[in-house]
Amino acid sequence: MTFNIIELENWDRKEYFEHYFNQQTTYSITKEIDITLFKDMIKKKGYEIYPSLIYAIMEVVNKNKVFRTGINSENKLGYWDKLNPLYTVFNKQTEKFTNIWTESDKNFISFYNNYKNDLLEYKDKEEMFPKKPIPENTIPISMIPWIDFSSFNLNIGNNSSFLLPIITIGKFYSENNKIYIPVALQLHHSVCDGYHASLFMNEFQDIIHRVDDWI
């Protein structure tokens, strides 16, 4: 997958990038997403919620270059043409999780089938990362389906160059005849500001509302 180099000296975000990268400023934001219509449609069609949410997340991420901006293995700043999800799968027997990645696809059915194939092959492997090699252009997505939360923060203390988003989903709950799910977004301030966090959440809510258009 193509990694497009950003020439820092000519980048219009240079001052912001250097300031927040040197400070190592990361932040998280959590929003309750209305999945009332989404959950009903997913159930009617016979699909699982988790991969359907992953698909919607990746549609937002791959639509916006800012969420694909990072530093590659050669320590170069740039952005990927496309990112793939690296998601957690829980093993009830071992009470541990596995991280599996699946190729992103704009077609929901294609992505869903690829997800199911990867899940079948790797979900029972007692390894943290059973599907190898893991491509550089992946972002972490996880779900904590046992609890809903109003905030969530995940820090990477030994990798100061990890700039890509980290997304965590919680347990859905009902309130006032609506169904909500908490979504936490962890961002590096060197590449993403509050505007971009809002952009992600608003576009994610929009694609969830428009489930009829893509499922």
Curated annotation (Swiss-Prot):
Q: Does the keyword Acyltransferase apply?
A: yes
Molecular function via GO: chloramphenicol O-acetyltransferase activity
Give the catalysed reaction(s), semicolon-separated: chloramphenicol + acetyl-CoA = chloramphenicol 3-acetate + CoA
Where in the sequence is the active site? 189
A Gene Ontology annotation in the biological process aspect, one of them, is: response to antibiotic
Q: Which InterPro entries match?
A: CAT-like_dom_sf, Chloramphenicol_AcTrfase_AS, Cmp_AcTrfase
Question: What's the Enzyme Commission number for this chain?
Answer: 2.3.1.28
Q: Which keywords does UniProt give here? A: Acyltransferase, Antibiotic resistance, Plasmid, Transferase
The protein's matches in Gene3D superfamilies, at most eight in alphabetical order, are given as: Chloramphenicol acetyltransferase-like domain
Keyword flag Ribonucleoprotein: no
State what this protein does. This enzyme is an effector of chloramphenicol resistance in bacteria.
Subunit info? Answer: Homotrimer.
UniProt family annotation: Belongs to the chloramphenicol acetyltransferase family.
Name of the protein in question: Chloramphenicol acetyltransferase
